[in-house]
Amino acid sequence: MKIMKRYIQVIFICWLSINSITEVYGKDPIGISLVKWSFRTQTAILCDMAKENGAVAIDMVDPEKWDIVKEKGLTVAMADGIDMGIERGFCDRRWHSSLIENYKRFIPLLAEKGIKQVVCYSGINTDLSDEEALEACVEGLKPLLDIAEKANVTLVMELLSSRNTEEIFTKQRFSYYQCDNPEWGVALCKKLNSPNFKLLYDVWHMNDMGRDIMSDIKKYHSYISHYHIAGIPERKGLNRTDSFNYKQFMNLLKKVGYQGYVGLEPDRIEKNLKSTIQESITLLKNK
């Protein structure tokens, strides 16, 4: 009888273990999001396309669109529209007063809506040294950390290409953008020393800067809370003929324990939206 009871206990424990594993690993720990500005269609229609193809969130969403995304049963992966544009960021003290006012006003609203992340930018820098720009960013961002921590909202600074070139893709770069490499971004994270300040690693932009993407992820993943990606090199939708190994990228994110979103961010897709989204998500899901 005792042996039978023990056998039943073992079976029950095994059943619980299997179900726990299923709960944790049964779903992909990485969610795919669609960056709003990249797809030239109405927000509600983009939400429908996302759901049809296995995306779970919309990315870089302005305040007036937050409720639309929520009503469609999707998550706002990253809030946008609170900053003053990519060029006017925290490394320039001229914008501190307005930026601080904007973020202080919107962070409580983000918390009310259940939105966990909001983008911010270093801005362009033509006058300061890297260290001076770092100190300027610290001065501008530090007043926001307490309110962000209390609201459980993370400020996420995007890494962007500053490469100055006359090539066809010039519009997708930002000359003199300060936060153009993860070393500088990580230095800022360390100075701020807050769990509510992280980096947005844009794969297309960092590849454009000549970075070793896989090496960066291995070194700096603990400072990164969000990723953006587009077809490399043309910044279209993802394609199997691209020079970048998307499967290796996604597998590495899982290996380092990443459990956030990867935002699909091609450059202004106006035609063939459905097929672009479908093929891109298929590649990111390793199918």
Language model: regions and residue ranges:
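Hydrophobic residues in well-ordered beta-strands that form the structural core
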Residues: V76-M78, M157, Y201, L264
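Active-site acidic/histidine proton-transfer and metal-coordination neighborhood
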Residues: D92-K198, D208
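Bacterial N-terminal signal peptides
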Residues: V10-S20
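Conserved radical SAM core fold
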Residues: D83-R88, N125-D127, S162-N164, A230-K236
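Structural motif corresponding to the early beta-alpha repeats
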Residues: D28-T41, D48, E52-E139, D267-I269
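Short, hinge-like loop/turn segments at secondary-structure boundaries
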Residues: T75-A79, W95-H96, A136-C137, F174-Q178, ...
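Positively charged n-region of N-terminal signal peptides that target proteins for export
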Residues: M1-Y7
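Histidine-acidic metal/acid-base catalytic patches
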Residues: Y25-G31, K36, R40-K51, G114-Q117, ...
